[in-house]
Amino acid sequence: MKITESVRTVISWSASIASQALSALTLLSIVFVGTSAPITEASPTQLTREQIAIIYMLLRDSGNSEEPSLPNTNAAADYYASNVQTQVVEAICLGCHVTNGFASSSDLIFSPGAENENLEAIRSYLQLRNDDGETLLTKVTGGLSHGGGVQLSVESDGYEALAELVSLLVAEDDSSGSTSENLFFKEVLLSDAKETLRRAALILAGRLPLESELTLAASSEEGLRLAVLGLMQGEGFHDFLIRSANDRLHTDAFVNGSFSEVSDLNGLAGDRYPMGETLWALEGAIWGYRTGIARAPLELIAYVIENDRPYSEVLTADYTMVNWFTSQVFRSGVEVGSFDDPKIFAPGQNRGSVAHDDQYFSESVPGFGTRVLEHSGFIEYPHAGVLNDLTWLHRYPTTETNRNRARARWTFYHFLGIDIETSAPRTTDPVALADTDNPTLKNPACTVCHDRLDPVAGAYQNYGNEGFYRDKWGGLDSLPDTYKYPEWFDIAEPTLYREGDTWFRDMKPPGIDNAVQPSDRVDDSLSWLAEQMVNDSRFAIAAVKFWWPALMGAKALVPPEVETDADYQARRNAYRAQELQISTLASRFRSNNLNARELLTDMILSPWFRAKAATPEASDRSVELADLGVDRLLTPEELDAKNEAILGYKWDKWEDDWLGNVKGFNTALHDRFRLYYGGIDSIGIKERNRQLTSLMANVAERQALSLACGVTALDFHDNETLSDRRLFTMVEASTTPLSEKALSVDVTTGAYRDRGTHDIDLPLSAGTKEFSIRFNNDAYDEGTENDRNLYIDAVEIYRDNQLVTVIEGEDFQNTTGFSQTIYGDGTAMGGVEYVDLDGLWTPVAWNLWGTGYVSFHVNVATAGNYRFRIVAWGSDYGDGIPANMTATVGATNAADQTVGSEAIKAQIQYFHQLMLGETVSRSDPEVEAVYELLLETWQERKMHTENSHAWSSPSEECLFPRDIHQSDWESGLGRDPEQMIYAWTSVMHYYLTHFDYLHE
């Protein structure tokens, strides 16, 4: 490796500081490779921007009083004029890289004679790629599929001059501290650490972050990084990896109903895997095997990432992933999972297939398939990670005329980031289109793509149409008989086939770019291809783009093509900025030994994920900033997980132990409404809707209607204390907008003589207040006539410990503002209770004989500290449970600020954080708007006659998880004496349909 000018500059800085203890090369070694071993010509280390900056700061702060001089900012311009403009740009590059030239769609365009403009074009290209000139210098030597092929050899003077210019420009850019990325984001606001971690947790792990994780994230950028990395484990992260990888590969087509020959043990698969017969007699085993085959490539990707193995192993792994069923059939010898759980996978090798040769004998078993009786031995399968996984090969099958080109196309696309179909314009020349003389090999209109595509297709030479290894008779190749023996099919052309061939002679030989597959790698040609690909700089860039939609909610941008479009420049700016970010991420990915968890973390910490808003100055940049940051629509699966994380359960979830169900359960969002809500099936629908449509909005509305009542009623019913609740942690079901204070208490069981007292103490302002008592647990047995009732003898009111007034129970109905429960048939619940006192039936109390309330107004003449003392008792039902009442003091005007209204607003404020991830003040207009919604709903509900429950059958319903039974309803689930559960249901519906709940 040659020491670039920037390194020479650093060394000169170091040499000028005579007193420092470390030599320049030792310092470079520590920064670059973590040791004090000196860097030599053979060191693979490459200088990056960050490393130059670190070295500069170390030398600057090393004790030398003089600031080291920065590189000469005119050096690059001077050097370019003397050594590059004429000798390289005009002599070589201007042939194609000009407007309307062959390379006019590239990111590097020159103009004849425009020295300064051309230098800036190179500078911009380097900033865009952000790889210290690696792409530029590789392309001029013919690498990275350079359309112009080799233009400069590494030994040439032109290459030396261009490399030196690159070094000078990189040094200048580093010293200026300015990049085009910084400029692109100068008017963009980023999410803070806690906001970022919340989004990351919901997307990566399907859960909310823990408090400890939030604290770590808020401590520093490194803390945020560690917190994000900590999310990447467990079932939620595994689901994210499987789902996201399938969004690209679409191998779940075979999970969702597409037929797969390679997993059909009753058909072609049984023909080649003798051990498949062992599963015939096991009920359901065929489905467990199909699950194992279908999920193997996705499980391989997940295994590599979850175990911090180099991402290159996705292609180079000498194993596949097996479950209990495929381990048996593949003869893997791996103990994994069990018959009852096909979802558990482990690494294992495929050692179970056989060739069809002269030693192969089989019989057909009616109702089952093919039984292999004899065979020559088991094939030593040459694993190449995903590339020769049975499901990958079958998902992208070939034909006798396609000749593995589809497989090659998707290999380029997914693992090198190249879309062959858009890499060059398609010809419309009728002469070229009419060419039948092997145009893919000879016609320039075709070879522009096929020269690159066909060698990779050749690397798939050992795999037949369905994906089986060397599936033709004899087990020597996979070449179609129409090519080998055309005379069998009345084809006039003579055969080109020669015994021992494994590839077509009328196509490019197997290879990639300028590399040709060695003759000793024919049997494992895909393994050889994988080795070439993972060492290609494009592999890391493709990995970033592969995972980009999973995090950002949109595919990586492509360059705009029509310069006359009104938004061309804005889209071009966005594309350039994103390409710069992707190049930076890819560079870090390589330096982190292709650790995918580190890559995902870098992507999350990037401004492309964290951007949350634009400043007013960016009002004219809506097109440029359209693909940034938040407001990423959640997929059906992600919304399902968010529901469970926040609400406690998924919409209409039910368990399913069918071995063909890869999840083990079903939900409304994941199954019945998945496609309606923008999901995919990987068969006919392969692109997710990234924008909410009217149909999707209807699904979101139905989900909200199905969940809102149930989650609200259950949270109040199942958890008596606020601290135990998931949602309603600041209010009780009895807390109303008018509430000042409430007391729920069991009263003494017995008779009039056994009555007891219960106090509510609170400060009150002057004015009219409402006092209410609610009986909560009425019970009556028709057989025994046992009856639990609540009796109120009196309500005594004190101010500053001085008795102000006494309201006798028998006088409630004569008190101002009297109100009581009215049943649907118009009858009232409650009345005066008479007791035999010394032989006289005397009115002594108010009897609440059913679940319901009684209330009246109290005039508070002056502000002060008040006590409401309730004198009460209850009758015995015979079960040992005392009568329970809730006494409440409240305002009569909804406009009053009460303890209840403040608690409700605090609850709404909490919901904004919990459900939307937004931190707002209690006085925020959004909080006020939601409060008004609740207030109006509550007031309207109080006008209904059938309002003692959160729903009233048959006109209303409340849906619960399937494990909630009638007995739960009978225990009081949904009882709503204050009509607040109903009111909160409307609020929950609001949040469940909120844009920020459906997006992250």
Where are these regions (language model features)?
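Substrate-binding/catalytic groove segments of enzymes
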Residues: 143-149, 421-422, 557-558, 922, ...
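Aromatic- and Gly/Pro-enriched helix-to-coil junctions and flexible linker segments
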Residues: 38-238, 242-251, 328, 491-538, ...
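His/Asp/Glu-rich metal/cofactor-coordinating catalytic motifs and the adjacent surface-exposed loops
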Residues: 177-179, 188-204, 208-209, 224, ...
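Short catalytic/ligand-binding loop motif for oxyanion handling, primarily in non-cytosolic enzymes
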Residues: 101-106, 254, 455-457, 608, ...
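Generic long, charged, amphipathic alpha-helical segments
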Residues: 558-569
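Extracytoplasmic
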Residues: 738-893
